[in-house]
Amino acid sequence: MLYLTKIRNAESEFTENEQKIADFLRANVSELKSVSSRKMAKQLGISQSSIVKFAQKLGAQGFTELRMALIGEYSASREKTNATAQHLHSSITSDDSLEVIARKLNREKELALEQTCALFDYARLQKIIEVISKAPFIQITGLGGSALVGCDLSFKLMKIGYRVACEADTHVQATVSQALKKGDVQIAISYSGSKKEIVLCAEAARKQGATVIAITSLADSPLRRLAHFTLDTVSGETEWRSSSMSTRTAQNSVTDLLFVGLVQLNDVESLKMIQRSSELTQRLK
């Protein structure tokens, strides 16, 4: 019996930790080549031995055997699906009804949020919030969907008094990066962590003495290696996607948490500015 089928059939018997493992494997089956049991255990907040025991419960000798089998099953399933239906986004195909599409999209976003939140190191997050709060100037970089997340964060930070630059043009991003100073912060948003434009800006910022904070995936990447701090995001999306939907959901959960943390750090003044912003915009109606 295929392991994905075994996981589905045994779901009612899983413990809480086993259910976490099962959800992670199904949501990230396309990315398992770069996932180790150690990394997975850290992300899920469980022991490595729990992952090994889960694999053995399904009939595998260990996690490596289970991981390789799942990768093979995923590849075979994708080839079969390609022959009968057109991929529209991630696991969604042209044969799916709107009801099925809605369920798949909702579950994809739910998993992205659950797994990203499970990954947070809250002590490190608090340190990052403190670093941002003291920055004279903040630059936010990103491309495509990540740029939209960055713009949303920049608007929120400006509302509570921070000096922020978030430009869509990559040449402008690079120009701003080279002008950063010690004490300034660059928040680089890139799920892959390998986009050359974002990496170039991070290199320039670091060279100038600025602190680089990366919002990126768990995968080893040039951006992760350059960053002083990382905030990890998890998305079950595969390369078969029409837009970075669950990736953007995961990234927004991180940036929203940063914003609320900064408001909390200086709550009286922040709330005054938020109230003034609200009053001004009300006058425009």
UniProtKB/Swiss-Prot annotation:
**Where are the membrane-spanning stretches?**
none
Which biological process, per GO, is one annotated for this protein? carbohydrate derivative metabolic process
**From the record, what ranges are coiled-coil?**
none
Pfam families linked to this entry: HTH_6 (PF01418), SIS (PF01380)
Q: In which pathway does it act?
A: Amino-sugar metabolism; N-acetylmuramate degradation [regulation]
Q: Which domain of life is it from?
A: Bacteria
Q: Which residues bind DNA?
A: 37-56
> Listed GO molecular functions?
carbohydrate derivative binding; DNA binding; DNA-binding transcription factor activity
**UniProt keyword terms in alphabetical order:** Carbohydrate metabolism, DNA-binding, Repressor, Transcription, Transcription regulation
Key word Transcription regulation present? yes
- CDD domains with a match to the protein in the record: SIS_RpiR
Q: Which residues form the SIS domain?
A: 128-268
Q: Where in the numbering of this chain does the HTH rpiR-type domain appear? A: 1-77
Q: What exactly does this protein do?
A: Represses the expression of the murPQ operon involved in the uptake and degradation of N-acetylmuramic acid (MurNAc). Binds to two adjacent inverted repeats within the operator region. MurNAc 6-phosphate, the substrate of MurQ, is the specific inducer that weakens binding of MurR to the operator.
What NCBIfam families does the annotation carry? PRK15482.1 (NF012026)
Subunit structure comment from the entry:
Homotetramer.
In its UniProt entry, what is this protein called?
Answer: HTH-type transcriptional regulator MurR
Q: Which lineage?
A: Bacteria, Pseudomonadati, Pseudomonadota, Gammaproteobacteria, Enterobacterales
Q: Which gene encodes it?
A: murR
